[in-house]
């Protein structure tokens, strides 16, 4: 475990994303944050994936590779996997709302054996992913129509990142058919009532965000699912909306979210 302590060193400690930016290793702190989440930054020769990790002023910080994910959404799933301690090694994964494949690529880099990339659209999956033998491209497919027979091997893990439809209509049918771990991206702009959605589709009210998350938690409970983690997404939606990442499954959990604190952090 990396640990920097002691009087002078502790006094000079700073966030890793700040250190990467200030040392000129990237052109913005946001870029530094993405590189760290992507596993491209090491401290003292050890990879660190937490942007807030404290490093000493004289610590050896290095950027090992360029950021080359096919989509910015990759950083959302990376944050979730780390926050919720999800290990995808040799897993069969289901990527609902695959689009260009940001989540799909993260799953592969984290050791997934097979990824089923499901999307209602067509021709969106990045060429390098469509050509990867570990990826099964299931375009023009409505996730709500999937059954156990849709897959040779049932999924161990399922991510859900959908737009223009509420999770209320997507999660229940998936959870009823697949007994696996889930991580869903909760997007207030597609869950809130019309009165809560402002100009350009942005939901700004903290109260509206809290209502969305409360409703999401109640939906899980109604469907026999237990929430095991909830964090703000490290990357906002393309329209500027704050979003959330939730982990859940049929396995019982004693996790109780502090929704107000999560929303406050997301909107800060």
Regions found by a protein language model. Give the residues of each.
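Short, glycine-/aromatic-enriched active-site segment of Class I SAM-dependent methyltransferases
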Residues: 188-205
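Flexible, glycine-/basic-rich loop-and-beta segments that form/coincide
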Residues: 242, 250-268
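S-adenosyl-L-methionine
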Residues: 116-165, 169
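Conserved alpha-helix/loop element of class I SAM-dependent methyltransferases that forms part
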Residues: 73-91
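Conserved class I S-adenosyl-L-methionine
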Residues: 89-99
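A short glycine-rich, Lys/Arg-flanked "PGG" loop and its adjoining helix->strand segment in the class I
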Residues: 168-183
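A basic, amphipathic helix-loop patch mediating RNA/tRNA/ribosome contacts
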Residues: 4, 8-59, 92
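Conserved SAM-binding loop of SAM-dependent methyltransferases across substrates and taxa
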Residues: 100-111
């Amino acid at each position: 475990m990396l640990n920097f302590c002691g009087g002078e060193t502790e006094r000079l400690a700073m966030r890793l994303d700040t250190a990467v930016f200030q040392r000129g290793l990237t052109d913005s702190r946001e870029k530094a944050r993405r590189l760290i989440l992507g596993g491209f930054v090491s401290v003292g020769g050890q990879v660190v994936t937490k942007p807030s990790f404290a490093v000493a002023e004289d610590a050896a910080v290095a950027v090992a590779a360029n950021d080359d994910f096919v989509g910015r959404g990759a950083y959302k799933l990376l944050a979730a996997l780390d926050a919720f301690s999800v290990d995808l090694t040799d897993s069969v994964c289901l990527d609902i709302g695959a689009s260009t494949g940001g989540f799909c690529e993260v799953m592969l880099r984290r050791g997934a054996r097979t990824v089923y990339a499901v999307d209602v659209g067509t021709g969106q999956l990045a060429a390098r992913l469509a050509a990867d033998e570990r990826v099964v491209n299931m375009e023009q497919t409505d996730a709500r129509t999937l059954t156990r027979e849709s897959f040779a091997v049932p999924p161990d893990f399922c991510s859900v990142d959908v737009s223009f439809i509420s999770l209320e209509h997507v999660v229940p049918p998936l959870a009823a058919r697949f007994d696996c771990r889930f991580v869903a991206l909760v997007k207030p702009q597609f869950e809130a009532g019309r009165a809560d959605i402002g100009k350009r589709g942005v939901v700004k009210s903290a109260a509206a965000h809290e209502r969305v998350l409360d409703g999401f938690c109640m939906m899980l409970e109604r469907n026999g699912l237990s929430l095991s983690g909830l964090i703000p997404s490290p990357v906002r939606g393309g329209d500027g909306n704050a979003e959330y990442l939730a982990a859940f499954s049929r396995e019982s959990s004693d996790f109780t979210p502090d929704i107000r604190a999560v929303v406050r952090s997301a909107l800060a």
